[in-house]
Structures are given as C-alpha cells and as structure tokens.
C-alpha cells in the first residue's frame, strides 16, 4: 500500500483545479489566465493565481487531466514525479509507470504521455492527494539511471536541498547499490558523484 507523505500546511486548503468543461470552457480559462486571475498548472489544468503550489496541488492538477483509470492504474514517475515534488519544470509529456504485472498496451493508445513498465519495491510508491507517485528515493534513483546528466544533476540537487524529501547523497548511492546489474548503473553512480561534488569511484 502506498505510503502517505505528510502534507505541507497551506493557507488555502484544497484550492480548486479547473479544467475545461467544469464550469468554464477552454477559451474562458485561457482568458482568465491572460487577465491574471488563473495560472496554468499543467497542460489544461488551471489554479487561482494567488494559491501556493505544493506537491499535493501538483498531483491533483496532473490527475485532473488524466482519465480516472490512468490515475488508479499508474504511478507518476521520473521527471514528472520530480515536478510533483517541486524540483523539475512542468512536463510537456507526463511520465507514468505501471507495474510489470499489468498490461500497458491499452494505456498507450489515446493519451499524450509516456508509459513505462517497471517493478516496484514495497517502499517505492507514496500517495499525494489520492495520486500514486514514486517515493523521493525511487524518483532520485530513476533519474540517475534514466535521465541525461544535464537534466538529472540539477534536478537531483534540488531534491537533495528539500529537507521534506528526506534524501541524502549517501541514501541515493545506497539505493543504486541495491539494484541488480543493469546497463546504466555505472553512469548513474557518476551522476550521483557529480551531485555530491566528488569524483566518481
């Protein structure tokens, strides 16, 4: 069962996330963005301009543009998870992960997103506002392995700078050491060494 991260207290509890069709059209939402009333959170999801962003709000925003079955069957991962945690830019194409025991062909058909088949450990998934997201540690390990150095290094540094995420360079390194052998593991260790500001061993 996903772990529940402790929410960050916010002055505006559960600000609305608005998408086309309820109760405004896409044109009306864009007009309110132009007027400075709303700001775009991700794709077609908008929030009041004065509300403070938090991981829970970004998770809700992402869920609002996905079909409910995707929200229930997938886990937000990689750079999209880093965005949820406030450590990466807004993704143009959300990255979703699905457990290797599930079928993913039907998830790829009609959505502008990337779906990867992976395997999860018992502590790899947390829940934010009802949305499953890879844990900070799993996210950091995935970024070190799967993202280009120029992308992963600054994002990992931002993640390590957030005390709430509970990450250290040593913890990420141990996460990599716990993985079975795979093609990009040596490069991932070099990425973590760069983040630590030390030469790779």
Give a label for each model feature.
Residues 1-201:
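Short gly/ser-rich loop at a beta-strand->alpha-helix junction or flexible surface loop bordering the NTP-binding
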